[in-house]
UniProtKB/Swiss-Prot annotation:
One of its GO terms (cellular component) is cytosol. This is Pleckstrin homology domain-containing family J member 1. Residues 15-108 form the PH domain. It comes from Gallus gallus. Pfam families: PH. One of its GO terms (biological process) is retrograde transport, endosome to Golgi. SUPFAM superfamilies: PH domain-like. It comes from the Eukaryota. PROSITE patterns: PH_DOMAIN. CDD domains: PH_PLEKHJ1 (cd13258).
Amino acid sequence: MRYNERELLSLSRQPAEKAAEILMRVPKKGSVLKKRLVKLVVNFLFYFRTDEAEPIGALLLEHCRITKEEENVFSISFIEEPERKYCFECDSEEQCQEWIEALKRASYEFMRRSLIFYRNEIQKMTGKDPLEQFGISEEARFQLASHKQ
């Protein structure tokens, strides 16, 4: 997927949901762990050299797996390219778990499923569809796959 470089640069400058300097290894042969500033903004994980303001890369956190590896280490791999695996080593196990949880919550699919879940809970409690007032209650993106019309 291609992105507009200026838009990505602008997005990388937005406030981060989570940011830290951690060790990172990219999926290149012979790659070693390097200290990077890693910044989660919406569903993008930007990574920077620690002394630079512009990102050197960005990962779109869709269709990916966030996996706990050994102690203090997690990885991100992509479902359609499992060999493309990024590894991150945190300072502590607690920091590692916080990153894993934040990254799993960052995807559009997670947000969509959460919206559907809470929509159904509100509907059970009130008897009303909370999206109806916005005229979007029948849109496919707000339906579970089995309920799409």
